[in-house]
Amino acid sequence: MATNVVLDFERPVVELEAKLNEMRECLRSSSREQAPVESDALSKEIETLEKKVDALRRSIYKNLTRWQKVQLARHPERPYTLDYIYMMTCDFVELAGDRHFSDDKAIVGGFARLEDRASGYSQPVMVIGHQKGRDTKSNLYRNFGMAQPEGYRKALRLMKLAEKFRKPVITLIDTPGAFPGIEAEERGQAEAIARNLYEMAKLTVPVIVVIIGEGASGGAIGLGVGDRILMAENSWYSVISPESCSSILWRSWNYKEQAAEALQLTAEDLLKQGIIDRIIPEPMGGAHTDPEAMASTLKGMLIEELKALMPVPEKELVNNRIEKFSAMGVWNDEG
């Protein structure tokens, strides 16, 4: 898929592709006028440049820094929760409101059906996730994916509903953090997130957590307790954003690259640390370059995980989940 947004580290590839397109257009427009020898020479030159572009693209995306992965996770054309829901599931019915205060548009959720027609697999699920906007108007409507307390309470209400009807829960995380406004604090932001952690740990149905973009601090963990944690290749998950970390440690946002390295916030880092269970491979260039391929990959992995989790007895499911999170962050001094 063509993209209108170019990140700094992608410019060398974009510039070569522009040159390549010019050469292709030149070949098309002049092939009838030029001698066969000249056309053949131009064709060979194009072929050589195509190989160079492909090699450069692979070199860039196979050697991304942690900060560059943060940039890809924030790409404005990256697929969001509703995109994945509509690409992966059918019969989605959105449910609204926390039954206490309001309906937070930064979190969406509802019942859907996860199907694989080739194998005949069909599983009703409850899917919940953060939702960002694509432009200024929709971002204001979605509060830039930063949930209020009522968003987390809505999410918990839907999880409890799924538990009542014995349906597994899938959460999709993509947030720069929970909304930090005074009004959110007055309505119990910290309590709402803490309550979700407590209740999610005890849910008697399978819970699969997927980090699809940004996973910042309490805003992410409020939907992040599950039996299996999957993470997109170019996403990030951390207690703090690189910019905020930089502003605290160096009193400036100019050290965000160093902060990203220190935080070790990528999928590869977190897999090594035992925080996540699997990495979801992305198309070359990021999920936004081929959203349908990305959704297909994620759908396949979700079906695999659900097939493994659905037969697990309730008590064992809860005990395993609690043990999984209790083991995180344990440090042993062997010296």
Swiss-Prot record:
The text of the family note is:
Belongs to the AccA family.
Q: In which pathway does it act?
A: Lipid metabolism; malonyl-CoA biosynthesis; malonyl-CoA from acetyl-CoA: step 1/1
Name where it mostly resides: cytoplasm
Q: Which GO terms describe its molecular function?
A: acetyl-CoA carboxylase activity; ATP binding; carboxyl- or carbamoyltransferase activity
What InterPro entries is this protein classified in? Acetyl_CoA_COase_a_su, ClpP/crotonase-like_dom_sf, COA_CT_C
Record has Membrane as a keyword:
no
Provide this UniProt record's keywords sorted from A to Z: ATP-binding, Cytoplasm, Fatty acid biosynthesis, Fatty acid metabolism, Lipid biosynthesis, Lipid metabolism, Nucleotide-binding, Transferase
Write the Enzyme Commission number(s) for this entry. 2.1.3.15
GO term, biological process aspect, one: malonyl-CoA biosynthetic process
- The answer to whether UniProt assigns keyword Lipoprotein to this entry is no
Compartments in which it is found = Cytoplasm
In its UniProt entry, what is this protein called?
Acetyl-coenzyme A carboxylase carboxyl transferase subunit alpha
Matching entries from HAMAP family are given as: AcetylCoA_CT_alpha
User: Gene3D superfamilies recorded for this chain?
Assistant: 2-enoyl-CoA Hydratase, Chain A, domain 1 (3.90.226.10)
